[in-house]
Amino acid sequence: MNQPELSYYGTGRRKSSVARVTLKHGNGQFKINNRVAKEYLKSDILIKDALQPLSITNTVSEFNIRVNAHGGGISGQAGAIRLGIARALLKVSADYRPGLKVAGMLTRDARAKERKKFGLRKARRARQFSKR
């Protein structure tokens, strides 16, 4: 009887973006929302950023990656994908943890847009003050 193919799941968040990442053993295909990653992210820098956990663990062409990303912008989604891939790799093998931890791949970037306060123009920008 055929065994179901093992898949490893990880969730990443960045700003208001959420990425649900699934890793399966394969040849290195990378799809985001059923589109090729190069077509979705467009920038090579963002693709390199998203795949950083795989390059740290030397597993770039060992896994097929499927991502469901929503919310925020492209840069935030790339950061969310990076965290999701790192978390999924931990489920593949705990041996990857030290390298990913040192590189800061397992830390959720908590920075987000600060809310606008009433009486101000933006979060901190006040109206120009005139003494006279």
UniProtKB/Swiss-Prot annotation:
User: Mind telling me which HAMAP family this protein's record contains?
Assistant: Ribosomal_uS9_B
Task: Tell me which Gene Ontology terms the entry assigns under biological process.
Answer: translation
Q: Which gene encodes it?
A: rpsI
Family per similarity comment: Belongs to the universal ribosomal protein uS9 family.
Coiled-coil spans are: none
Q: Which InterPro entries match?
A: Ribosomal_Su5_D2-typ_SF, Ribosomal_uS9, Ribosomal_uS9_bac/plastid, Ribosomal_uS9_CS, Ribsml_uS5_D2-typ_fold_subgr
Instruction: From the record, give the cysteines joined by S-S bonds.
Output: none
Molecular-function GO term, any one: structural constituent of ribosome
An example GO CC term for this entry is: cytosolic small ribosomal subunit
Q: Origin, by domain of life?
A: Bacteria
Q: What is this protein called?
A: Small ribosomal subunit protein uS9
What keywords sit in the KW lines?
Ribonucleoprotein, Ribosomal protein
